């Protein structure tokens, strides 16, 4: 609806320009927002205040002329002026009801992308292999997954890329430990984290071991057959651990999506050669660097993007440049989204600028770093175990499920054990994910089990319960929505408020896809659940005064349920029919 209103305003501006009321050449960005107070309509625009000065008019006077110039539209009941010159648009209830009927009849809930579909590469998760995933890997994994799901729902072709850290010094360390303890190492490989810790301890304590580890890295990079065999083994075990967690989290990632650092090894010399051929390299203390005018340090000196060390080794920047070129040339991406820690912002700014300068990507290709903040403990400090260690992701999920089990059992002691465990799994995993997804990705946040498992506030249990209320209505009715006739009629205040929110679903998803911010979808679903609760309590559904009203409210209830379920699925959360 916002796009329709923008179009109406643009037509009014064109008419006023043609009539000489407005000067020619004005190209304002027309802003239309949802109103918070429905007594002020459904949508508001500040266009009259934006253009009052160039028009040489008072904002309210210009607002009056804009209203007079607006074309008639079946979706708008009236337009009023508010305050210093806001235009407030009131939706036509009958037209709104028709839109909701169309959404109810559509598998996509009336949501379709504006503009052509794109090929979008989503770079997400990317754990370092050879050790278990920890809580720090959660954000990239689930935020990237949520945005990828929304993009697919809107019609884009999404190519997931799990840029795992499968190359580097940690593998030399593991190889050295394997050589030193062949019998013990074979049995210890099942516990990859323990194996890694034992190898790291030797690396830190023994200079001879550390030297041997570095030499084995050189042998691995040179293609030594035995080193490569063991390297593949380490990676296979590590990736199987990752996949088990992806499956448990309900994340759409598979082995087919893995494109790790090692996949670009063969292209790294060519990346450096191509940068040299374009005259972009400068030697600095033996290292090969790219200097770009827009990047300087605090003292105003140029910052280097180092692509080759003095000893000939390559860096993350080199690999990222190779990956960017691959995504442009082979994957034919229109847009690439990198869900990587916010602390890497400067790195990606420099890599993207260098890739464009070198012609590795076409000018039309969008490169976007979707940075995120850190996940802290309840005290606001980095999330650690009691002994100061890193919290494994599997430990976090185990505790979430156990806490959810105790919560559900306390509320429903009569449920069978297997049903309790099933509900606890859904609630526990959903609570962990939603606690993260509901925060703006750029912000740090404090993880708190008590808050995230609450049935009050913007939490997964609250939304899951809202969906079960919808399911409960139809369970009590004994019929599905396909068996319900009638049409939606919006009479009560609560019906109109719920309907207006339902109609915003498509525009909301477009914003999530554009900005890479799933917290907006969480906020929308929370608001929707609250409006449904008000509707449920104030507008009798099964006990409505007549059949037409009952059927209308059942149809509104069904659309609410489908929207909640679809929204939660786009966040990667399972739903429950009863709790």
Swiss-Prot record:
Principal cellular location given in the protein's record: cytoplasm
Subcellular location: Cytoplasm
GO biological process terms on file: arginyl-tRNA aminoacylation
Top-level EC class as recorded in UniProt: ligase
GO cellular component: cytoplasm
Enzyme Commission (EC) number: 6.1.1.19
Key words, A-Z: Aminoacyl-tRNA synthetase, ATP-binding, Cytoplasm, Ligase, Nucleotide-binding, Protein biosynthesis
Motif ('HIGH' region): 127-137
Superkingdom of this protein's organism: Bacteria
Catalytic activity field: tRNA(Arg) + L-arginine + ATP = L-arginyl-tRNA(Arg) + AMP + diphosphate
Pfam families: Arg_tRNA_synt_N, DALR_1, tRNA-synt_1d
GO molecular-function term, one example from the UniProt record: arginine-tRNA ligase activity
InterPro entries: aa-tRNA-synth_I_CS, Arg-tRNA-ligase, Arg-tRNA-synth_N, Arg-tRNA-synth_N_sf, ArgRS_core, DALR_anticod-bd, Rossmann-like_a/b/a_fold, tRNAsynth_Ia_anticodon-bd
UniProt family annotation: Belongs to the class-I aminoacyl-tRNA synthetase family.
Subunit structure, interactors included: Monomer.
Protein's UniProt name: Arginine--tRNA ligase
Source organism of this protein record: Ectopseudomonas mendocina (strain ymp)
Lineage of the species this protein comes from: Bacteria, Pseudomonadati, Pseudomonadota, Gammaproteobacteria, Pseudomonadales
């Amino acid at each position: 609806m916002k796009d329709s209103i923008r179009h109406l305003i643009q037509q009014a501006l064109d008419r006023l320009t043609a009539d000489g009321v407005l000067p020619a050449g004005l190209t304002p960005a027309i802003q239309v927002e949802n109103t918070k107070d429905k007594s002020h309509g459904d949508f508001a625009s500040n266009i009259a205040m934006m253009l009052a000065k160039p028009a040489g008019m008072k904002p309210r006077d210009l607002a009056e002329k804009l209203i007079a110039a607006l074309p008639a539209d079946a979706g708008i009941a009236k337009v009023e002026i508010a305050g210093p010159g806001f235009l407030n648009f009131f939706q036509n209830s009958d037209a709104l009801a028709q839109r909701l009927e169309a959404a109810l009849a559509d598998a996509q809930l009336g949501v379709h992308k504006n503009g052509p579909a794109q090929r979008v590469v989503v770079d997400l998760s990317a754990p370092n292999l050879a050790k278990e995933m920890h809580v720090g890997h959660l954000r990239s994994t689930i935020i990237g997954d949520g945005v990828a799901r929304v993009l697919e729902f809107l019609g884009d072709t999404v190519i997931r890329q799990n840029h795992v850290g499968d190359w580097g010094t940690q593998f030399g360390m593991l190889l050295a430990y394997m050589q030193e303890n062949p019998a013990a190492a074979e049995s210890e490989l099942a516990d990859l984290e323990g194996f890694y810790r034992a190898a790291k301890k030797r690396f830190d304590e023994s200079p001879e071991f550390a030297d041997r580890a570095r030499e084995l890295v050189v042998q691995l990079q040179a293609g030594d057959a035995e080193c490569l065999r063991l390297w593949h083994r380490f990676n296979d075990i590590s990736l199987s651990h990752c996949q088990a967690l992806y499956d448990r989290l309900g994340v759409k990632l598979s082995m087919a999506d893995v494109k790790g650092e090692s996949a670009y090894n063969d292209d790294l010399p060519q990346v450096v050669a191509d940068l040299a051929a374009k005259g972009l390299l400068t030697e600095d203390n033996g290292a090969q660097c790219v200097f770009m005018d827009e990047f300087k340090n605090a003292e105003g000196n140029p910052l280097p993007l180092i692509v080759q060390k003095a000893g000939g080794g390559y860096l993350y920047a080199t690999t990222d440049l190779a990956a960017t070129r691959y995504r442009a040339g082979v994957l034919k991406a229109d847009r690439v989204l990198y869900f990587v820690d916010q602390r890497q912002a400067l790195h990606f700014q420099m890599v993207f600028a260098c890739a464009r300068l070198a012609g590795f990507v076409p000018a039309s290709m969008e490169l976007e770093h979707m940075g995120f903040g850190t996940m802290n403990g309840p005290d606001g400090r980095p999330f650690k175990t009691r002994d100061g260690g890193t919290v494994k992701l599997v430990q976090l999920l185990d505790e979430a499920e156990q806490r959810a089990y105790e919560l559900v059992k306390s509320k429903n002691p009569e449920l069978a054990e297997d049903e309790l465990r099933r509900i606890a799994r859904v609630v526990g995993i959903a609570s962990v994910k939603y606690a993260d997804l509901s925060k703006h990705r750029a912000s740090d946040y404090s993880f708190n089990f008590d808050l995230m498992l609450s049935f009050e506030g913007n939490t997964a249990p609250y939304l899951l319960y809202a969906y079960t209320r919808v399911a409960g209505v139809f369970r009590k009715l004994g019929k599905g929505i396909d068996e319900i006739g009638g049409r939606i009629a919006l009479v009560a205040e609560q019906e109109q408020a719920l309907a207006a929110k339902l109609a915003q679903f498509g525009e909301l998803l477009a914003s999530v896809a554009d900005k890479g911010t799933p917290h907006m979808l969480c906020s929308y679903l929370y608001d929707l659940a609250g409006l449904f609760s008000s509707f449920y309590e104030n507008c009798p559904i099964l006990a409505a005064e007549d059949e037409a009203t009952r059927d209308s409210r059942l149809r509104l209830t069904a659309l609410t349920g489908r929207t909640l379920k679809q929204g939660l699925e786009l966040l990667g959360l399972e739903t429950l029919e009863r709790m």
